[in-house]
Amino acid sequence: MSKVKDMTIARSVAETWLKACQHFEVFADAPGYMAWTYVRDARHAGTLDLIDDAEISQGRHRFALSVALELPPVQSAEDALALFNLADWLDGITVVCKEFGVEGALMLQIKGPLDELSEATLNAANRKLAEAKAFFEDL
């Protein structure tokens, strides 16, 4: 598939997604060994967990924060390819699709030491989400 056609599909998917996600943010109930984060948008409220993944780096536990945003259903192989290609272009962002015809998710992963989970970390997540949204808006 040509890059031009690929970008056309990606733009269509992104525009649909942006219309649905008028507002979203990341916040935590309580920082700690395990905390819950939420993503809110116009259609959907999802819960995700922040879990110690048992990796120890320099004597410190690590965490992975994943932010998932609901995407329109993937209708074809071309849709899926467009989404995966977008993921390659966005640093730190992964697009996950189980199979064609099944909803995908846009995920942002931030890794760092658990004891540094703070408002600054959540603010950084919000900045990355804003960058991703701006990228889609520019397509």
Where are these regions (language model features)?
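Well-ordered alpha/beta subsegment
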Residues: G92-A124, E131, E137-D138
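Ordered hydrophobic segments in well-structured contexts
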Residues: A35-T37, D49, A64-S66, M107-Q109
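Short amphipathic alpha-helical segments
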Residues: K5-V13, Q75-D79, T121-E131
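Short, internal acidic amphipathic alpha-helical interface segments
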Residues: R60-A105
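Charge-rich, low-complexity N-terminal segments
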Residues: M1-I51, E55, V74, W89-G101
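A signal for specific C-terminal beta-sheet/loop modules enriched in small/flexible residues
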Residues: L50-A68, A120-A132
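Short beta-strand-to-loop capping motifs
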Residues: R40, V67-L71, I110-L114
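Conserved short hydrophobic interaction patches
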Residues: W17-A20, L83-L90, A125-L139
